[in-house]
């Protein structure tokens, strides 16, 4: 059984027991969270597709950890002008473990 839900402007395909990395959520570590923007649920040959969201279906997950991703370097370089600008960025993320699809 798997489901497709939306979080942080992205769609994620998950199954029970899977750990995924989402955009930062303002939820404490160890707490349970429910995602109600489920777009599709498949259980064998039984497939339900929302238009765009399924009513009454939720994906339950437990927050495992928060953190920051790898650094991405941004470089702006102008040739022959002796001009260069460097910047770095580390995106916040939340790891969640899917506990149920109902």
Curated annotation (Swiss-Prot):
Its family remark reads: Belongs to the bacterial ribosomal protein bL21 family.
- Source organism superkingdom: Bacteria
Q: Which PROSITE patterns match?
A: RIBOSOMAL_L21 (PS01169)
A GO CC term assigned to this protein in UniProt: cytoplasm
Q: Which residues form a coiled coil?
A: none
Single GO molecular function: structural constituent of ribosome
**Quick check: keyword Methyltransferase in the entry?**
no
Role summary: This protein binds to 23S rRNA in the presence of protein L20.
Name of this protein: Large ribosomal subunit protein bL21
Q: Which organism is it from?
A: Proteus mirabilis (strain HI4320)
Q: Is RNA-binding one of the keywords?
A: yes
Gene Ontology terms describing biological process: translation
Sorted keywords for this record are: Ribonucleoprotein, Ribosomal protein, RNA-binding, rRNA-binding
């Amino acid at each position: 059984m798997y489901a497709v839900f939306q979080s942080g402007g992205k769609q994620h395909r998950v199954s029970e027991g899977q750990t995924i990395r989402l955009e930062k959520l303002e939820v404490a570590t160890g707490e349970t969270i429910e995602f109600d923007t489920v777009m599709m649920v498949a259980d064998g040959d039984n497939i339900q597709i929302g238009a765009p969201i399924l009513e009454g279906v939720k994906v339950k997950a437990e927050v495992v950890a928060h953190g920051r991703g790898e650094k991405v370097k941004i470089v702006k370089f102008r040739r022959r002008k002796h001009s260069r600008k460097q910047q770095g960025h580390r995106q916040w993320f939340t790891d969640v473990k899917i506990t149920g699809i109902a």
